[in-house]
Curated annotation (Swiss-Prot):
The FYVE domain is involved in the binding to phosphatidylinositol 3-phosphate (PtdIns(3)P) which is required for the association to endosomal membranes. Both IUM domains are necessary for efficient binding to ubiquitin. This is Vacuolar protein sorting-associated protein 27. Residues 260-279, 304-323 form the UIM domain. Residues 347-369, 482-494 have a biased composition (Polar residues). SUPFAM superfamilies: ENTH/VHS domain, FYVE/PHD zinc finger. GO terms for molecular function: phosphatidylinositol-3-phosphate binding; ubiquitin binding; ubiquitin-like protein ligase activity; zinc ion binding. The gene is sst4. Residues 20-151 form the VHS domain.
Amino acid sequence: MSRWWNSNSQFASDIEKATSETLPAGSEEISLYLEISDQIRSKSVDPKFAMRILKSRIDHSNPNVQIMALKLTDTCVKNGGSGFLLEIASREFMDNLVSILRSPAGIDEDVKMVILRYIQSWALAVPDTNSPLSYIIHVYQNLKDGDYEFPEPSQNITSKFLDTETPPDWTDSEVCLRCRTPFTFTNRKHHCRNCGGVFCNQCSSKTLSLPHLGINQPVRVCDSCYSLRTKPKGSKSRARNERKFHAKTRKTPSKPVTNNEDEDIKRAIELSLKEMPQSREPPSYERPSEANVVISQDQHLTEDEDEELKRAIAISLEEAQKSSQKDDNVTAPNNMNISYPSVPAHTVSTDIRSSPFSGRPSDNPSTLISTADADNITLYATLVQKLKKLPPGSIFTEYQLQELHENMGVMRTRMMRSLGETMSKYNGLIQALQKLQTCMRLNDALIEQRLSSTYAHHYIDSSMDSNRSIEPEPDVISTVRNSSTIPQASSSSVPKIVVDSSPVTENPPSHSDVMGQKDTISSYYSTDTDVSANVMGNRHDEVVFSDTASGEKNTKLNIDESTNYYNTDSIDKVGEPFDEISSGYDDLMNGNDKQGNDIPEVQEASLIEL
């Protein structure tokens, strides 16, 4: 847009230079006049903008400037083309000339005569009153009826004065007008500046200047126009045939051809369209087969081809290859299951297909971008970038860019709506994810609580079992050597005593060995107190003996060592009456048995509570 404004500024400066106040009267620069008219005819400058610049110079207060501006306007009318003629024939320009003629402040006679002469010549050159230029005739008749005297025309004026060959309007087609190749994202459209037809790059790769159209710089032309403009003169009939061919082609651009080659191309296109839904590639880029077409076409690119377009195509192809590789890596089996670790009474197994949050393709077509939309976006961006390098005013000749601009507005609305829907879905998924995380945390806490209670209960049960298993039996140890037996009571409530008659095979541990143990019996037993029968029958006590016969007095023994040292029998092996155990018990406590032998002194021990 800045280039377009700069081009308009340059055009305004050229007009100001051609109608400068410093120029003497009658010293018009015809070459500059023709250059300005060529800019208008080549559509490098908007005709309306050119008309308003000339109108501002005609309204100048200097009569010399007004006359030169009128002469420049007449030159542009005869050489500027039909677009500029329509602007001159508008009410804006013609009414301004009438207002100058009828100015209350008066008007210079030379300026008045120049205005009347040009209005008369333009009106006489208009072929018909029904033409778009008929307002010039209407103004001419009103001035003629208003007692304005027009000068006699210096020559016979016909409509040929206004016939100017201008660049044709561009046509559109889905196939190349020369080779009938369909246009795609990579096979772009190109318009011939001479005939206005649309061709592919191979059929319009040549450039040529067109001075008869006011285009002095080399521009793109098709091969047919290039051969017509460069061949020797003398073949006018062939040139007319070529013009007729282009005219017929523009009228029927999509007319099918009947030869076998075109039919094969059509069948190939239909097959490719049928295979397109089965393709796994995203719709935003072309298939590899079209990439090969790009490579083959890039070999025929000429120096005038836009380098930025080449880079854009190369980048798009690289992105297409990367996207295809990512799709191959991401694709996974649809029947894949996810199983979580098992815990007691809790087993979780989910299926991706049954998950409400599993990734599924959207069925809403408004959220998808078709291949045509992606191509239009890329083409629009490419044309905008290319417009910066084109000559000033080329934006008015880029009709395709204007159409794409309108399409971008509609597409922007659709994409904004799709973006809103996508954001709503995203927010919903975020909320669902937060709820899922909360549920997972609660589930983990419940599992940990249940495991803790289970382990604690198991620990208590095992402790109780161990206490029962290690509780000492109320057995009384004896080392009577004469194998005398003391009768035991059958009741389980009274301690029962069994006397072991086996001889002692080894000496009890010494005092120094017992004191070296970690858990000694000295802290739990008292060797100075006698044990009564009643206390012995009511408490489960562990006892130690001092064997006077062995030579050691009151030796303190460890519990484990004493158990290993003496032979102990369970109380269940004895079933003697209670009266016999009472008498035997009294004798044992007094230190004598029935045979009169000495008995080791029995000392009371405190029960170790486990």
